[in-house]
Swiss-Prot record:
It is found in: Cytoplasm. The active site is at C199. This is Octanoyltransferase. In the reaction, the free carboxyl group of octanoic acid is attached via an amide linkage to the epsilon-amino group of a specific lysine residue of lipoyl domains of lipoate-dependent enzymes.
């Protein structure tokens, strides 16, 4: 599948869909913004404001960010899934679907601000394409992963950590447009996941690429993920923010 070249500029439920490569999707460009390390509330407020201000001509965007430690609880989430009340990690209640999850250093978070009507995408199709992008990203590092029916996200396919969750997904659709997105664990302190039932599942093991013996660079994985998201969403793209915003340490 061909994708338009990426340019660098500066600046801070049915399953049917248009066939991949259709003109309708190529006419919907994507802007990729590398936001660096950013407080969760800042990103949350920004994507809500972006969505509220959208017009029919607003280009779609993907935001790549890393958050300081934070738990987020979906709009229908059960607070009982936070098992340790005094963990020292803040909890933010948000308007996405799903239960509780954790974001922290060493994790890639990708927010997808898309006009689904313009892309002729149904929500279930969008979820499938996001999951496929993550599966393809992990495959690039020789990691086999799978979906689970009724449990959005991506899971290790087999081995000692078979069934463990390595990526989470949660979206909000407002006026036909999506925000929130996915998180992919690269090299994290995984202990905060022990204080929750991840995504509402008691005892669910959470892993990162490092615990699967893949010494991957955060930047490299982020670039691979962006490429696979663009390919699966089939949009022309322009990457935003200065290249130095991509600098990241896995230490």
């Amino acid at each position: 599948m061909s994708v338009s070249p990426v340019a660098i500029v500066s600046t801070p439920v049915a399953v049917s869909a248009s066939p991949a490569g259709s003109p309708a999707q190529h006419d919907a460009p994507l802007t990729v913004r590398w936001r660096g390390t950013e407080a969760y509330q800042t990103s949350f407020d920004a994507m809500r404001a972006f969505t509220d201000a959208r017009t029919a001509e607003t280009p779609d965007e993907i935001w790549i960010v890393e958050h300081p430690p934070v738990y987020t609880l979906g709009q229908a989430g059960d607070p009982a899934h936070l098992l340790v009340a005094d963990s020292g990690v803040p909890l933010v209640k948000v308007d996405r679907g799903g239960q509780i999850t954790y974001h922290g250093p060493g994790q890639i978070v990708a927010y997808l601000l898309l006009d689904l009507r313009r892309r002729k995408l149904m929500v279930r199709t969008l979820v499938t394409r996001i999951e496929e992008a993550v599966i393809e990203t992990l495959a690039a590092y020789n990691l086999a992963s799978v979906r689970k029916a009724g449990a959005p996200g991506i899971y290790v396919a087999s081995g000692v950590h078979g069934g463990a969750k390595i990526a989470a997904l949660g979206l909000k659709i407002r006026n036909g447009c999506s925000y929130h997105g996915l998180s992919l664990n690269v090299k994290m302190d995984l202990r905060p996941f022990l204080a929750i039932n991840p995504c509402g599942y008691a005892g669910l093991e959470t892993v990162d690429m490092a615990s699967l013996e893949v010494a991957a660079d955060w930047n490299d994985v982020a670039r691979t993920l962006v490429g696979r998201l663009i390919a699966n969403l089939d949009g022309a793209s322009a990457a935003a923010d200065k290249p130095h915003a991509l600098e990241h340490s896995n230490d």
